[in-house]
A protein has these predicted regions:
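Conserved, structured C-terminal
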Residues: 1-200
Length: 200
């Protein structure tokens, strides 16, 4: 896959002064998802970090980011919700990651939550059906586009004058869609394996 930083720089228009720095090695990411995610983060980090930075009377909008300082450390927070519930992705400085993770996990267990890996998160995300969000490397990758998804027209406004990738989508639609993405519900675990019918 093309690294995120390469994707960002590829969108730079001629003459624009844009720079990007990869700081991923300095951060640890924890997803806090579910109906009590807001309460948990509010108790650990305070309500202000969850506010809309452009309208502090409201909470963060879906797919927005905040930054905040805590004990001299710089954090990033994104409002997500891959499971069609309240959710955030918290980017914690490596220097305090172990300490913060222990606090978050302890608080989650106090609330009756669970500590799960990516498999558990993916199961909840897929169970959300059309409301579960796709992930890079799982449902989409450089070899698939939004056009391949059944609900493409409801998610992408092709009437919008410009967006990154529009030219490619217009071309794909004109040439005829060759692939479709679908969800298969199976019995048992079939991760990273094909789905067979009559041995094929």
């Amino acid at each position: 896959y093309i690294a995120d930083i390469d994707r960002i720089m590829a969108c730079k228009k001629d003459g624009e002064e844009v720079w990007a720095k990869d700081i991923s090695d300095t951060l640890l990411k924890i997803d806090v998802q579910g109906p009590l995610a807001f309460k948990l983060l509010k108790e650990v980090y305070g309500e202000n970090v969850l506010k809309n930075r452009y309208n502090p009377e409201k909470n963060m909008n879906f797919f927005t980011f905040n930054q905040f300082e805590r004990n001299g450390q710089h954090y990033y927070l994104s409002r997500t919700g891959y499971t069609n519930r309240w959710g955030w992705e918290l980017y914690i400085p490596v220097a305090v990651a172990e300490e913060d993770a222990k606090i978050i996990i302890s608080k989650a267990l106090d609330f009756g939550g669970l500590l799960v890996g990516l498999g558990g998160r993916d199961e909840n995300r897929i169970s959300a059906g059309p409301f579960g969000l796709p992930l890079m490397g799982q449902e989409y990758d450089p070899y698939h586009t939004p056009v391949n998804a059944p609900l493409f027209e409801t998610a992408v406004d092709m009437n919008k004058e410009y967006f990154v990738g529009k030219e490619g989508l217009v071309k794909e639609i004109a040439e005829g869609v060759q692939k479709r993405l679908y969800i298969f519900v199976s019995e048992g675990i079939v991760t990273n394996r094909g789905i067979y019918k009559e041995g094929k």
